[in-house]
């Protein structure tokens, strides 16, 4: 028997968390967070992490997993999420997959096999070859090894060419093999995939309000504390939306008002990219908050 999963995706500030909590309370569910920044400890305000009060209402999984100077791959996330989903279902509860990181959601509900971690040696070896022979020579090798992948990569895209070759060198398998399941549903799940898609003017207003609230709650102080305890401002976790602008403010590159406006502008851009991602996903249903009650009635068959 397949495990029923309800996915609630959508852009930042679209209302995913509140909707998921409301539905999980009604359906006796638990939430599996799919947010690539909420996995970090100590980064609460800038990632709009569910509050302790919200987490006391409904269990939230895959939040506060790693430290800001650590990393997690989509493959590692996939493994953890599937283990948690199995556990939630075994206890007679409904798993809710909730978040704005589309790649994380896709990694869980599609039949994707991720390549193993590759030793840094291979990347250095390829980099040295590029320096000696030129990027064109290395790209030509990729065309012979994995023409499917090469056909999707610009001959000037050094990062993706390097990634494709390092996987092949390390595993003996073209990276295209690992991407075959990208449009195939994971066979153990029965998924309802919903995407909150509010009108742009409403979404942008919510973004403005959210950023203002983050400042009121202490985003500046949270960022300063992360730096004070020794985390480098160059960490990928701290070079994300909100934190990077506040770091520039703390360095004297912005006044606070300019930093806040920059966060709002970049958040709007990020939300637009998220919306595009979700609209291009397969087997999704776009809904507005106003339609949620009708949609809930349709999916209430998931109640145990």
What residue ranges belong to the model's regions?
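Phosphate/pyrophosphate-binding catalytic cores of soluble transferases and nucleic-acid-acting enzymes
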Residues: 1-304
């Amino acid at each position: 028997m397949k495990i029923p999963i309800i996915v609630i995706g959508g852009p930042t500030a679209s209302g995913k968390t509140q909707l998921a909590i409301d539905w999980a309370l009604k359906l006796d569910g638990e939430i599996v967070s799919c947010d690539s920044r909420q996995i970090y400890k100590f980064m609460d305000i800038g990632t709009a992490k569910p509050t302790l009060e919200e987490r006391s209402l409904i269990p939230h999984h895959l939040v506060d997993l790693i430290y800001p100077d650590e990393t997690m791959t989509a493959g590692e996330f996939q493994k953890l999420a599937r283990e948690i989903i199995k556990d939630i279902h075994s206890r007679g509860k409904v798993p809710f997959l909730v978040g704005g990181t589309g790649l994380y959601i896709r990694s869980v509900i599609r039949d994707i096999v991720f390549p193993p971690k590759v030793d840094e040696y291979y990347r250095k070896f390829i980099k040295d070859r590029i320096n000696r022979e030129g990027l064109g020579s290395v790209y030509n090798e990729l065309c012979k090894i994995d023409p499917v992948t090469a056909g999707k990569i610009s001959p000037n895209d050094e990062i993706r060419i390097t990634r494709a070759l390092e996987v092949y060198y390390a595993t003996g398998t073209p990276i295209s093999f690992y991407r075959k399941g990208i449009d195939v549903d994971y066979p153990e799940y029965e998924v309802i995939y919903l995407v909150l898609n509010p009108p742009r003017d409403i979404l942008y207003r919510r973004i403005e309000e959210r950023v203002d609230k983050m400042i009121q709650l202490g985003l500046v102080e949270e960022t300063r504390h992360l730096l004070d305890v020794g985390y480098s401002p160059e960490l990928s976790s701290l070079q994300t939306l909100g934190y990077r602008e506040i770091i520039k403010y703390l360095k004297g590159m912005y006044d606070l008002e300019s930093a806040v406006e920059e966060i709002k502008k970049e958040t709007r851009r990020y939300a637009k990219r998220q919306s595009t991602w979700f609209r291009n996903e397969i087997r999704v249903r776009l809904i507005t908050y106003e339609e949620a009650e009708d949609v809930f009635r349709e999916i209430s068959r998931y109640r145990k």
